[in-house]
């Protein structure tokens, strides 16, 4: 540890009634007050998304099966054969938008919309996504206009494949792309081993990155739902555009090995600044 240094608060919550522990806001309120003067643009939303069907194996994030590897900026997807199972296609996304509008959801998350998913995982690839180039069957402007006509917004997806430096190099361009196309919220993802090597999801370097991404997003009035991030510690009090942390074994595991019934109960009875986003 190097000086000067500030250590975080440590808390002990004691009560004769377990309900008091669950309701305690002490951890949240030990964080610094809100860092933003204007928070009128921050609004939690209910959303549905094009993602579960991929998790369940009914569709794919990738546009084609023809490419064992992708080189962004050089690979021409128009010369490939679509696999016919790409989930983030115009008609499918419009179907989700219609559902959201009918059932009172605010936004529609769309995963797999951007080029690069053919070799995104397990390749230790630095330049894996550019966060601004859609697949041929995903019309960004048309779909955002269609969503707007239905009183719904699209939610952006930034999977980084844990290539963190690549994300930081592109983050301003990615956030500006969102603003230009009507997005105001992003689900970020950090699947896989962290690049650069030697860093870990819960280490200080990555904690600094998560905070950097949230603060940078605020410059563009964008809210962040961080996935594969760290457990909530109340930083959302200081930076309230951090609207979610995926930090618990949630719904997606039901498509894998499943979760025990008691686990589902624990998620809602564990005291913390958890936001309830458990996808």
Describe the role of every protein-language-model region.
Residues 1-37:
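N-terminal accessory beta-strand-rich subdomains and adjacent acidic, glycine-rich linkers
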Residues 44-48:
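Transmembrane beta-strand segments of Gram-negative outer membrane beta-barrel proteins
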Residues 55-203:
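Aromatic-lined carbohydrate-binding/catalytic grooves of carbohydrate-active enzymes
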């Amino acid at each position: 540890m190097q000086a000067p240094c500030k250590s975080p608060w440590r808390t002990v919550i004691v009560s004769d009634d377990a309900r008091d522990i669950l309701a305690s806001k002490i951890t949240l309120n030990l964080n610094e007050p809100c860092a933003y003067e204007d928070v009128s643009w921050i609004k939690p939303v209910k959303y549905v998304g094009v993602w579960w069907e991929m998790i369940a194996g009914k569709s794919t994030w990738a546009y084609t099966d023809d490419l064992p590897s992708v080189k962004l900026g050089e690979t021409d997807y128009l010369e490939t054969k679509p696999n016919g199972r790409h989930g983030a296609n115009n008609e499918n996304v419009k179907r989700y938008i219609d559902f959201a509008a009918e059932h009172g959801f605010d936004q529609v998350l769309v995963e797999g919309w951007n080029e690069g998913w053919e070799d995104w995982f397990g390749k230790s690839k630095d330049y894996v996504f550019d966060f601004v180039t859609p697949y041929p069957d995903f019309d960004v402007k048309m779909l955002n206009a269609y969503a707007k006509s239905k009183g719904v917004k699209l939610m952006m997806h930034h999977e980084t494949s844990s290539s963190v430096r690549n994300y930081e190099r592109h983050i301003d361009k990615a956030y500006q792309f969102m603003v230009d196309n009507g997005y105001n919220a992003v689900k970020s993802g950090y699947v896989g081993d962290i690049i650069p090597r030697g860093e870990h999801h819960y280490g200080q370097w990555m904690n600094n990155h998560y905070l950097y991404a949230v603060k940078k997003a605020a410059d563009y009035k964008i809210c962040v739902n961080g996935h594969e991030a760290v457990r909530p510690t109340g930083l959302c009090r200081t930076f309230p555009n951090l609207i979610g942390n995926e930090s618990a074994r949630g719904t997606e595991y039901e498509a894998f090995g499943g979760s025990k019934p008691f686990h589902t109960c624990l998620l809602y009875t564990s005291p913390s600044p958890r936001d309830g986003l458990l996808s």
